[in-house]
Amino acid sequence: MISDANTASSPATVAARFVDAITWGEHTVVWQLLSGSGRSVAVSVALANGLDRVVAARISDDVADPAEFDDFLRQLIRGLRRDLRSVDVSELQVGSCVVTGGVAVAHLTTPSVIPGTDDWAAGRLRLSMGGGGVWTIDRLEPIVAGP
């Protein structure tokens, strides 16, 4: 799905928009920014966490009831925040972004709490260029520290 959320020209811009959407709970923007692969992973994780198979199929086929789809997206935001639990999501920043062909890796950082030290790595976003030159999010790979 191409929308205003993901028509930005650079993977770093799309990655920053994705981080902002997680921070502010913009669940529909998060979904719009996910690639087909990213959406499949999100539905698979939800299935493993108890999502009904019929609901999952409707979500995958883009025919879900608006209320069940909204509930799924809210759970997705909670899951992404849980994945990033070792950092304050409101302080996440997109650092370097390495592009190789139609694939990009955006490195996520968070400010260090120790004076005089560099930002800390918080994870990576893997992106791919889809049809029409649109960058989308394939996967969040958090660096988890703590419980």
Question: Where are each of the predicted segments found?
Answer:
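Short beta-strand edge/turn micro-motifs at domain boundaries
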Residues: G95-P147
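Short secondary-structure boundary segments
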Residues: M1-S10, D83-E91, V98-V99, A121-L125, ...
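Amphipathic alpha-helical interaction segments
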Residues: E26, R39, I77-L80, I143
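Generic preference for flexible, low-structure residues
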Residues: L34, V43-A46, G50, R85, ...
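Surface-exposed, charged secondary-structure patches
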Residues: G50-D118
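Intrinsically disordered, low-complexity regions enriched in Ser/Pro/Gly/Gln/His and often acidic
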Residues: R17, W24, D65, S128-M129
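Short, low-complexity N-terminal intrinsically disordered segments enriched in polar/charged residues
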Residues: M1-V45
